[in-house]
Regions:
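Glycine-rich, positively charged N-terminal anion/phosphate-binding segment
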Residues: 1-10, 19-95
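Alpha/beta catalytic cores of nucleotide-metabolism and tRNA/nucleoside-modifying enzymes
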Residues: 1-15, 20, 25-26, 139, ...
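Active-site beta-loop-alpha junctions enriched in small/polar residues
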Residues: 19-21, 44-46, 74-76, 102-104, ...
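Conserved beta-strand positions in the central sheet of alpha/beta enzyme cores
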Residues: 39-40, 70-72, 98, 141, ...
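Short, solvent-exposed helix-helix connector turns and helix-capping sites enriched
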Residues: 52-53, 120-121, 234, 276
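Alpha/beta enzyme core
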Residues: 82-113, 117, 121-199
């Protein structure tokens, strides 16, 4: 494997997948604290950057403690993509630029962006070459899906093209655009991509446990993994994966109190950033639904989360939930992990504190 990216040297990096509306600065920092090695911003429209849209620029904000961090751009105009990449480098100096060739969302695909370029390899190649040349020597990476649909799976060919354009590493999501997020990720194709190029390939898709990560690492030649939906409900999954990679033992989820502390921290910081608490917390409802998946009495919590509009309400729900059998939110003791010495060992292995 050849790479100019130092985080691959003698390591198996864990990426946090870029997810629109999810991987903002606050959530990225939470995941970093729990062991994510490499972060990527929410995808940013190259046209928005090119036209110096101030809202677009807000998506680029990050702290030095998040490094290594890449800014992900999407678009289909090579000249505009190149200029946008140059502007991003001038504005925020990321560690790399990432190109989105995998987004399945209709409004992106309709403009020939995201996964639409898997059907238009000449434009995909032109975009990649233009951006690589525009920001050299800064590394440029890319993310793709395995193809447009089941009849046009071309990930290996696309990977070869991107490698030839100077792309430094490639993340591959194991579904087609037509699948969206349904069905199963095809790790056979991801493995073929990893075999077919010399740049690092990062596997992505259906990685919901440490055991699954180790299985995919063993079965393929991937150089790292990218965690998406699993992190939305359990940002501590990065710590669990690292512990399992080092020790071969499973690390339980954090205590219930720690999980609630993460949720409340996220809500408080989000409200502070927005300035309007009620709007901020309403915008967090979908995120709270995701967090509830790893909490006892998830259904009852989701019903409560649908109506919250202040941090105080969330704190009250947390207090009730942790206290025991009140208001129908009785924690199921069989699903709560007891205090475990392995958590202390994990912090030693990973050299970080989840409460830092």
């Amino acid at each position: 494997m050849f790479t100019t990216l130092p985080w691959f040297n003698a390591a198996f990096p864990l990426y946090l997948a870029p997810m629109a509306g999810v991987t903002d600065k606050i959530f990225r920092q939470i995941c970093k604290r729990y062991g994510a090695d490499v972060l990527v911003t929410e995808f940013v429209s190259a046209e928005g950057v090119f036209r110096r849209n101030e809202r677009t620029r807000e998506y680029l904000d990050f702290a030095d403690g998040e490094r290594p961090l890449g800014v992900q751009l999407f678009g289909a105009n090579p000249a505009h993509m190149a200029e946008a990449a140059r502007q991003v480098v001038d504005w925020v100096a990321p560690d790399f630029i990432d190109l989105n060739f995998g987004c399945p969302v209709n409004k992106v695909v309709a403009k020939n962006g995201g996964s639409a370029l898997l059907k238009d390899c000449p434009t995909l190649s032109s975009v990649a070459k233009a951006v690589v040349q525009a920001v050299a020597p800064l590394p440029v990476t890319a993310k793709i899906r395995i193809g447009w649909d089941a009849n046009s799976i071309n990930a290996v060919r696309v990977a070869e093209i991107l490698q030839g354009c100077g792309i430094a590493a490639l993340a591959v999501h194991g579904r087609t655009r037509a699948q969206g997020y349904s069905g199963e990720a095809d790790w056979r194709v991801i493995g073929e991509v990893a075999e077919g190029v010399t740049i690092p390939v990062i596997g992505n898709g259906d990685l919901f446990s440490a055991q699954e990560v180790v299985r995919r690492r063993t079965e393929t030649k991937i150089a790292g993994v990218m965690i998406g939906r699993a992190a939305m409900s359990a940002p501590w999954i990065f710590r669990q994966i690292k512990y399992y990679l080092v020790t071969g033992e499973l690390l339980p989820a954090p205590e219930l109190s720690e999980r609630w502390n993460v949720i409340i921290e996220h809500c408080r910081r989000h409200a502070a950033d927005w300035g309007d608490e009620e709007q901020a917390i309403r915008s967090m409802r979908a995120r709270l639904m995701a967090y509830s998946k790893n909490l006892p009495e998830a259904k009852a919590l989701r019903e409560r989360f649908q109506h919250v509009s202040t941090v105080g309400e969330i704190e009250d729900i947390a207090e009730t939930h942790q206290a025991g059998p009140k208001e129908g939110l009785r924690p199921n003791a069989s699903r709560l992990e007891p205090a475990d010495t392995r958590r202390t060992a994990a912090r030693s292995v990973l050299n970080f504190s989840p409460t830092a």
